Amino acid sequence: MERMDIIIWLLAVVIVLTTLMIFLHLKTLKIIRLLFPISKELSKKSCVFPWKKKWTKNYPPSSMYP
């Protein structure tokens, strides 16, 4: 029974962390950088959160498309 309690507790922690990352991803990014230095290197390359990257810089203006 103790193993089931640990699994349920871990699932709850994962759910809480994912919701925090969705709604408060800027604040959790700072916390993650403090906890995991490896993710700091990844976030510099914008691999962790690709939606923060402005894709419009690499593409021509929308007026060129039909």
From Swiss-Prot:
It comes from Loxodonta africana. It is a single-pass membrane protein. This is ATP synthase F(0) complex subunit 8. The modification N6-acetyllysine is found at K54, K57. It is found in: Mitochondrion membrane. Coiled coil: none annotated. Component of the ATP synthase complex composed at least of ATP5F1A/subunit alpha, ATP5F1B/subunit beta, ATP5MC1/subunit c (homooctomer), MT-ATP6/subunit a, MT-ATP8/subunit 8, ATP5ME/subunit e, ATP5MF/subunit f, ATP5MG/subunit g, ATP5MK/subunit k, ATP5MJ/subunit j, ATP5F1C/subunit gamma, ATP5F1D/subunit delta, ATP5F1E/subunit epsilon, ATP5PF/subunit F6, ATP5PB/subunit b, ATP5PD/subunit d, ATP5PO/subunit OSCP. Subunit 8, of the mitochondrial membrane ATP synthase complex (F(1)F(0) ATP synthase or Complex V) that produces ATP from ADP in the presence of a proton gradient across the membrane which is generated by electron transport complexes of the respiratory chain. ATP synthase complex consist of a soluble F(1) head domain - the catalytic core - and a membrane F(1) domain - the membrane proton channel. These two domains are linked by a central stalk rotating inside the F(1) region and a stationary peripheral stalk. Keywords: Acetylation, ATP synthesis, CF(0), Hydrogen ion transport, Ion transport, Membrane, Mitochondrion, Transmembrane, Transmembrane helix, Transport. One of its GO terms (biological process) is proton transmembrane transport. Belongs to the ATPase protein 8 family. The chain crosses the membrane at residues 8-24. The keyword Acetylation applies. GO terms for cellular component: mitochondrial membrane; proton-transporting ATP synthase complex. The modification N6-succinyllysine is found at K54. It comes from the Eukaryota.
